[in-house]
């Protein structure tokens, strides 16, 4: 039976502002990435998200981003590798404290937004992220864009496990990178198209680029976004379609 991880970015509410559909999404995913306060989230939200994740027995990971609350961590920043290292180490250490306090164990780290996209093509950024993970806890996995040489090389250098990730509702360029969110065609808004893309990636190992060319994708985890208007409906549908196709949903071991 084919096995795949379904992950989702959660814990992105901040103070009085609610973001996402965390409670409703949790039953349909196998791992979550918790915002750590830089691009979203706050200490109380981090604690509550960890506690809910443990109740649902899903794998918990840190979701560090750039210090950019107003831009939700989606804007590129001109930063050094040392700054990236500091940002990531600080954030994963903070989440790890909440996980340990709740009696759990953190499983992975997935960079957020612009940090993720920059790391996918910038070896220095990817190296800084992997180095922070290695120094924090080398048993933590790194979730990174499938086929990214920068992520692959950084994980190999520090001997940490790379979990290659694909996206359910994002379009791909010919080189295998994600279409920028500044482009009109960055998101797949049709639910059936997104589901077909996921099945194509999981069962056949490729995705159609925006140019119509096939791009090889060997994904071990699929990201579902939890903040869309129909996010819960989509997650439930993916979950049931996987069941019908005998695709097991399980966090990486």
Curated annotation (Swiss-Prot):
Protein's UniProt name: 5-oxoprolinase subunit A
InterPro entries: Glyco_hydro/deAcase_b/a-brl, LamB/YcsF/PxpA-like
Gene that this polypeptide is encoded by: pxpA
Function (record text): Catalyzes the cleavage of 5-oxoproline to form L-glutamate coupled to the hydrolysis of ATP to ADP and inorganic phosphate.
Keyword S-adenosyl-L-methionine appears in the UniProt entry: no
Superkingdom, taxonomy of origin: Bacteria
GO molecular function terms listed in the Swiss-Prot or TrEMBL record: 5-oxoprolinase (ATP-hydrolyzing) activity; ATP binding
UniProt KW keywords: ATP-binding, Hydrolase, Nucleotide-binding
Keyword Transmembrane helix: no
GO biological process: carbohydrate metabolic process
Coiled coil: none
Known catalytic reactions: 5-oxo-L-proline + ATP + 2 H2O = L-glutamate + ADP + phosphate + H(+)
Entries under Pfam families matching the protein: LamB_YcsF (PF03746)
Subunit description: Forms a complex composed of PxpA, PxpB and PxpC.
SUPFAM superfamilies cross-referenced by the UniProt entry: Glycoside hydrolase/deacetylase
CDD domains: LamB_YcsF_like (cd10787)
Organism: Bacillus cereus (strain AH820)
EC number annotated for this UniProt entry: 3.5.2.9
Similarity annotation: Belongs to the LamB/PxpA family.
């Amino acid at each position: 039976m084919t096995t795949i991880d379904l992950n989702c970015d959660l814990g992105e509410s901040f103070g009085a502002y609610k973001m996402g559909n965390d409670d409703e999404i949790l039953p349909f995913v196998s791992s979550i990435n918790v915002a750590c306060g830089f691009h979203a989230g706050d200490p109380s939200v981090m604690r509550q998200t960890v506690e809910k994740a443990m109740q649902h027995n899903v794998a918990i990971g840190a979701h560090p981003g750039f210090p950019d609350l107003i831009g939700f961590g989606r804007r590129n920043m001109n930063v050094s590798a040392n700054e990236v290292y500091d940002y990531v180490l600080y954030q994963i250490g903070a989440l790890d404290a909440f996980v340990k306090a709740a009696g759990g164990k953190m499983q992975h780290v997935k960079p957020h937004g612009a940090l993720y996209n920059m790391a996918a093509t910038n070896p220095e950024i990817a190296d800084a992220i992997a180095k922070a993970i290695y120094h924090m806890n080398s048993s933590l996995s790194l979730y990174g864009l499938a086929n990214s040489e920068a992520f692959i090389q950084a994980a190999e250098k520090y001997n940490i496990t790379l979990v290659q990730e694909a996206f359910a509702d994002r379009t791909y360029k010919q080189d295998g990178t994600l279409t920028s969110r500044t482009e009109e065609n960055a998101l797949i808004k049709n639910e059936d198209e997104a589901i077909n893309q996921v099945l194509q990636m999981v069962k056949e190992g490729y995705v159609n680029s925006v140019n119509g060319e096939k791009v090889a994708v060997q994904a071990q985890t699929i990201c579902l976004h939890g903040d869309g208007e129909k996010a819960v409906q989509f997650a439930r549908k993916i979950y049931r379609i996987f069941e019908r196709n005998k695709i097991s949903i399980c966090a990486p071991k």
